[in-house]
């Protein structure tokens, strides 16, 4: 069995109510708008401190806990026509503290928790690298200078290529300077959440929930 995972418009319309909803979406242009032949808009989301509670280096799946209100915020992004795409630095891979399989389990938990409230992310991009070498237990193949680790824009640029995204019509939302710098480098609008810092024209919000309520 094969599965084609797509952010395009796919809905079961096997009941009268669902059929009516699909017809409405078709009339409103939502079906054609989600076709990847057309330019897409995205909200790029940092993970730690933006979606889940910040605990420093998250090494254990039991440490993963969504910030209250995140499910509702992601639902609003899903309904808005924007793609919801996670872009996260995960140096715990390079440090040898979390395996790729364990990271996948953490992200599976995140998607399951979101799904319980009807929310979803369209894609997850992560950078496993870290430039500093010489630590016990590290994985040398990931101890490199890369193009994907924020504040570099590599993950956003890759997503833009994969999903035909217009970066100038998209947002980078995160809780730290590296998120904002990556968004600026990619040509996105930027929003800082949960921080008292200020970066030029970057908009500040208490949380992702406040961002979507005010900007979408």
Describe the residue ranges of each PLM region.
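Conserved alpha/beta core of the MobA/IspD/sugar-nucleotide pyrophosphorylase nucleotidyltransferase superfamily
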Residues: 1-38
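Substrate-recognition element of Asp-dependent hydrolases with the DxDx(T/V) motif
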Residues: 70, 74-110, 120-133, 183
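Active-site neighborhood of HAD-like aspartate-dependent phosphohydrolases
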Residues: 39-84
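Active-site flanking residues adjacent to catalytic metal/cofactor-binding acidic residues
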Residues: 45-47, 88, 174-175
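Asp-based, Mg2+/Mn2+-dependent phosphohydrolase catalytic module
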Residues: 101-122, 132-134, 139-172, 176-216
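Generic beta-sheet signal
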Residues: 4, 87, 127, 173, ...
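Metal-dependent phosphoesterase signature
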Residues: 52-68, 93-101, 116-117, 139-147
